[in-house]
Structure formats: C-alpha cells, structure tokens
C-alpha cells in the first residue's frame, strides 16, 4: 500500500513538473526539415552547334517527375542573357511579373496568364536591334527596322492554361511554368527558341540562322527511345492542344480549320473529325514513341496549309536514318499514314494541290529553259527584260561580312548562286540599256524565302517597305516599316534616296509562287504594279520552329504574323493576276511586252 502511494505521488509530481516545464522551460526538439514536393537539377545550356551557353536550374515535381519546370526569371535569363523577370506576390496565388519590356499577371490557382501586351512582355528582339519591338524580322543587313504601328495599340490577352490541364506553380520567389509551355509563349518571328531534351537545354541566340538544318542530331538522340513515360505523354498532348489552338495562325485552308479548330480547340476538333481525327488523337497520346511520331505526321495532314506547317517532328528533327530506331519508327509511321488516308479520303485533294504545284513548277522551268537557256537569270528581247528570281533567300553570310567590313561586296562572280545579287545585276543591265523599257521579275517558280528580301524589292520598285500582317490571337493589325539600303553600299543614308529605275515593272506569277512568292504580288498589285500569269499559290503566315514537350521540333504557321494586303485582307487564297496567261505564254515575250506597255499607257 505504501509503494502504491509513493508511486502515485511520483506520477503526480512528474505530471505537474511536466506542466510547469512546458511553460517555464520549454523543450526544443530537433529542426524538422521542409518537405519539398520537387527536386531541382542544374542542366547545361547549349546552342545548336553544341557550344556552351551556361546552365539553368529546372524543377521536377513529384506528381510529374518527367516534366521539367522552369522559373520565369531563369527562362528569361537564358533567352536574353543579362535580363530577368521579377515576380512579386500580390495576393494568395496572385503574382505580378515584370520583364524588361512589359508586365503580366499569373494566377496559379486558376492557371491563368494575363497581359495587356504579351508581345512586349516576351520581347527578345532587342538582341537583334536595339529598341526593336516584338515583330517579324529576319535581320538581313540590307534592311533595318524603322517603326511599328499596331491597331489597336494594346489588347488584353488571357491565356487559360488551366482549361487544358496545364498546371502553373509558384513559391515565394518566382512563378514556374512547364519548360515547353513557356518556350511556346516566347518563341518569336526571329525564331529565338529554347527546347529541353531530358538532359540539355538548347537555345537559338541567332534564331533561324542557327537552325538552317533543323534540330541537330546530337540534341535529338537522347529522345529516341521506344517508349515515353505516362506523365510526359499526358502533358505533351495537353501542351500541344494549347499551343495549336491558341497560337496557330489560321491561314484558312486546312482540314481542321474547316472542322472548327478555332472554336472547339484541337482536342475536340480531333474527336469530331471521324476516324482520321480520332486515330490521330490516340496516336498523339500514346506512350509508344513510334505511334506518337506517327500521330504528329497524321496531324500534319489535317493541318496541311500548302507548305508552312509540318507538325511531323521528323521534318526538322534530324534522326540518323541508319539507326534501328529510324527503321522501326518509319515502318510504323508509313503504315499509320496509309491507314489514316483510308479514313480521310478528302486529304487526297489537299495532297493534289501540292502535287499540281510541283508539276507546274517543273513545266515552267522546262519552258523557261527552252526559251532563255539553262540557268539564265537575265534575258532580253527587244524592249523587254526578264529576270529569273527563284528564291527570296540570299547568301546572308556573305552580306553580313560585307556590312561588318569583313569581306567584299557580293557580286555575280563571287556569289553566282545569290538571287539578290542576280536581281541587282539584272536591274543594272536593264537600266543601263537604252532599248529596255519593261522589266519582268519572274517568280513563277519561286516558293518563298525571307520577307526582308520582299521589303527590299518593294522599296526598289515602289519606294515602299511596309510589312503588313495581323496577329490572329489579339486581332491586331500591324504595319512594320523598314529602312532599306537601296544602293547596297553598306550604309543607310541619303544616297539610298537617289536610287531610281526608269522601267515599267511587272511580275510573273503562278500557283507555284508561295509564301513570300505570294506576299510580293499582294503588295505590288496594291502599289500599282501589273501581275501576269496565274493566281499565286497562297501561304499567308509566318513560320515558327516550335519545341515539343519531348524535345523534338516542329514547324507551324504562327498567330504572330498572318500576312495581309493594304486592305487588311488575308492573302492566303492567292493573288489574282492583272493579266492571266496560259503556261505557253509565260515566256512569250512579245505578248508580255504588249500587255505591260498597254497597262502603263492606260495607267
């Protein structure tokens, strides 16, 4: 009994003592480490040549371990070194983002991005020319940006990532986007872009000039596995749906556009497009890499716009054709495309347009050769001169060296394959020949190139250098004006105003004339230059290389630049000639001369 009493007393003392200690002498336990729901990985950043461009910290959240996230600030820093984006938390789940050129807000509860000028917020073009806004420019040294008019000036943009199941995240210091998602938001008309292949981030500081051969084989190689993880397959499909619904340029001719792509979104449009669309949807969602790649190819059939959009990731992603992966993948892709065609017989009409254009181009080249000779770029008959101009591309490296003072000015002797050189040579010959009155620029077999060259030509022919386009996301119409080095002496000065040609200009076009070969006739016709031939082939959108979530690249017509004429009309249907010609008359110089001289006499 005594022992029990003593034990009871002891227990009471312990209990009372414990109560007293909890107030007067608290016991401090060991620190409990913060439990993070992600891991971070510092990964190398390279350019397309594999040269080091630094490192960047990526996050991988536990619920999506295969999908890389990046802070907005870190992403800005690799895209525009020396700059960043600051994030300020303004309320629970609400953040204000400030970049060097603009602002935006993010709601991480609703997964919502908003901005009154999202192009300013993502503007990287200051790296190309100081003070330049986010507009289309290939940065050939023969022209330079002058001004940009936007109508209206600002439009509020709301991008609802949550609608597509894309999760935006944050901590106290920054906002985090899936890497591919923010890369899609930033890619611009110069093709500044970034992609992540699971090991390395690739950036393109020189835009399209560093991606002339597409995505490098070394960058693509780590992606070439037979399967994809479930979280990557799910996210990649959601991200593709968001991008092609919101950022597609909607030229107006694709099968999915005609099936309500813009109104329904990509996912629903595929579900509603019969067996062909449903098959494509399942392939794109597949964890089998071969099936997925096949799905990007069949999607390309549904978005075929004549030559700008290629969602088939094998088009610009270099894959070694001697590898077992390529052999197996190509067998699956070929079989799936054949199956798709049985579900989508209307695709035959789309493919026929491409085939007919190619056949016409071959026919016209043969007729030109028969009349003027093989490879002849300048041909004169009586008072009329023809200049064969087969591409809106030039040897940009040669011209860049000249403008930097590192090399001689390109000439027909040193750069015989440069179409810009050929044009200038032809103009000088015609201008200095007293017999020549009419100058016909033949772009009847020209499939496109750089809009910078288009601006150069409109400046010489019409003293105008205005690039007209609309943003299909915001509805804004743009007029981007350029200074042009009209005498190509390497300087932008008053001597450029002295350049003048006393010639009756005309343009020869056909359905093969596509993209820039469609833009030039659209502008020249509005400026009063006669067009001869057949209706041009269309192609109204600027083209972007875009990263897929897996790390592949694809290309598509972008919302950032759907080309318009001076009336504000989409030019994708093609441009009707002033005088229609049968193919037998394209190089009937006598008939062409009569039409051109009649036009100018009655003008």
List PLM regions with ranges:
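Linear, non-domain "peripheral" regions
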Residues: 40-57, 64, 83-85, 141-161, ...
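N-terminal low-complexity, Pro/Thr/Ser-rich intrinsically disordered segments
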Residues: 25-56, 222-225
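C-terminal "post-core" interaction segments
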Residues: 207-227, 234-237, 241, 393, ...
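Flexible, low-complexity junctional segments that flank or bridge functional domains
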Residues: 101-105, 119-439, 445-447, 452, ...
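Bacterial Sec-dependent N-terminal signal peptides
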Residues: 8-9, 15-35
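Amphipathic, non-transmembrane alpha-helical segments in extracytoplasmic/periplasmic proteins
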Residues: 67-82, 175-188
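Extended intrinsically disordered, low-complexity coil regions enriched in Ser, Thr, Gly, Ala
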Residues: 79-111, 191-197
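Positively charged n-region of N-terminal signal peptides that target proteins for export
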Residues: 1-4
């Amino acid at each position: 009994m005594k022992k029990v009493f003593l034990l009871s007393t002891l227990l009471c003392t312990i209990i009372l003592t414990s109560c007293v200690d909890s107030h007067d002498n608290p016991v401090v336990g060991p620190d409990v480490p913060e439990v993070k729901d992600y891991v971070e990985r510092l990964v190398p950043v390279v350019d397309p040549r594999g040269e080091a461009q630094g490192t960047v910290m990526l996050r991988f959240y536990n619920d999506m371990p295969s999908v890389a996230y990046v802070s907005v600030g870190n992403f800005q820093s690799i895209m525009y070194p020396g700059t960043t984006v600051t994030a300020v938390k303004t309320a629970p789940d609400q953040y204000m983002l400030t970049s060097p050129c603009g602002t935006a807000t993010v709601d991480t509860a609703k997964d919502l991005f908003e901005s009154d000028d999202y192009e300013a917020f993502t503007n990287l073009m200051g790296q190309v020319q100081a003070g330049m806004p986010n507009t289309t420019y290939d940065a050939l040294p023969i022209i330079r940006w002058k001004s940009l008019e936007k109508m209206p000036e600002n439009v509020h943009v709301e991008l609802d990532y949550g609608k597509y199941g894309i999760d935006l995240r944050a901590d106290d210091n920054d906002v985090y986007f899936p890497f591919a998602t923010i890369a899609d938001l930033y890619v611009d008309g110069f093709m500044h872009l970034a992609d992540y292949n699971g090991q390395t981030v690739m950036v393109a500081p020189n835009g399209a000039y560093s991606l002339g051969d597409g995505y490098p084989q070394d960058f693509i190689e780590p992606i070439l596995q037979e399967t994809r993880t479930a979280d990557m397959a799910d996210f990649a499909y959601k991200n593709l749906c968001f991008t092609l619904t919101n950022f597609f340029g909607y030229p107006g001719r694709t099968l999915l556009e005609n099936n309500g792509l813009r109104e329904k979104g990509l996912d629903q449009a595929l579900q509603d497009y019969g067996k062909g669309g449903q098959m494509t949807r399942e392939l794109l969602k597949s964890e089998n890499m071969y099936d997925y790649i096949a799905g990007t190819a069949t999607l390309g059939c549904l978005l075929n716009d004549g030559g700008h959009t290629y969602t088939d990731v094998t088009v610009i992603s270099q894959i070694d054709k001697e590898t077992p992966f390529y052999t197996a993948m190509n067998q699956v892709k070929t079989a799936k495309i054949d199956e798709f065609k049985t579900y989508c017989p209307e695709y035959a009409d789309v493919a026929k347009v491409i085939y007919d254009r190619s056949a016409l181009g071959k026919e016209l080249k043969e007729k030109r050769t028969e009349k003027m000779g093989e490879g002849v770029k300048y041909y004169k008959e009586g008072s009329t001169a023809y200049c064969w101009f087969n591409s809106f591309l030039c040897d940009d490296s040669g011209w860049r060296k000249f403008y930097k003072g590192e090399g001689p000015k390109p000439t027909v002797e040193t750069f015989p394959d440069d179409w810009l050189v050929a044009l200038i040579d032809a103009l000088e010959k015609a201008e200095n020949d007293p017999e020549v009155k009419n100058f016909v620029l033949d772009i009847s077999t020209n499939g496109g190139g750089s809009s910078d060259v288009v601006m150069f030509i409109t400046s010489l022919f019409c003293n105008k250098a205005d690039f007209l386009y609309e943003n299909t996301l915001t509805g804004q119409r743009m007029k981007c004006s350029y200074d042009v080095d009209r005498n190509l002496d390497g300087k932008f000065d008053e001597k450029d105003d002295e350049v003048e040609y006393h010639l009756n200009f005309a343009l020869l076009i056909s359905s093969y004339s596509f993209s820039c070969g469609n833009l030039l006739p659209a502008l020249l016709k509005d400026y009063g230059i006669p067009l001869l031939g057949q209706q041009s082939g269309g192609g109204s959108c600027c083209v972007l290389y875009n990263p897929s979530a897996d790390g592949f690249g694809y290309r598509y017509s972008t919302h950032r630049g759907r080309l318009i004429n001076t009336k504000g009309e989409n030019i994708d249907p093609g441009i009707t000639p002033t005088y229609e010609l049968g193919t037998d008359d394209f190089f009937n110089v006598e008939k062409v001369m009569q039409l051109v001289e009649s036009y100018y006499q009655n003008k």
